[in-house]
From Swiss-Prot:
Part of the 50S ribosomal subunit. Belongs to the bacterial ribosomal protein bL31 family. Type A subfamily. Binds 1 zinc ion per subunit. It holds the Pfam family Ribosomal_L31. This is Large ribosomal subunit protein bL31. Its cofactor is Zn(2+). It comes from the Bacteria.
Length: 69
């Protein structure tokens, strides 16, 4: 490796989410701000929602006789 061409690597970089969650990781930046993390993302919290565009979901459920969970 060539000397003095690589960025400084911080082993204690702080990641701050808009929800207030913080955690430590390694990065070339000392502090990282994010809008969504695993604490507030719907996939990880189990609060997923189906986005219905013009009744398509209801038509699909009606066509295949499916019930909403």
């Amino acid at each position: 490796m060539k000397p003095n061409i690589h960025p400084t690597y911080y082993h204690d970089a702080v990641v701050r989410c808009a929800c207030g969650n913080t955690f430590i990781t390694g990065s070339t930046k000392k502090e990282i701000r994010v809008e969504i993390c695993s604490k507030c993302h719907p996939f990880f919290t189990g609060q997923q929602k189906i986005v219905d565009t013009g009744g398509r979901v209801e038509r699909f459920r009606k066509r295949f006789n499916l019930e909403e969970k």
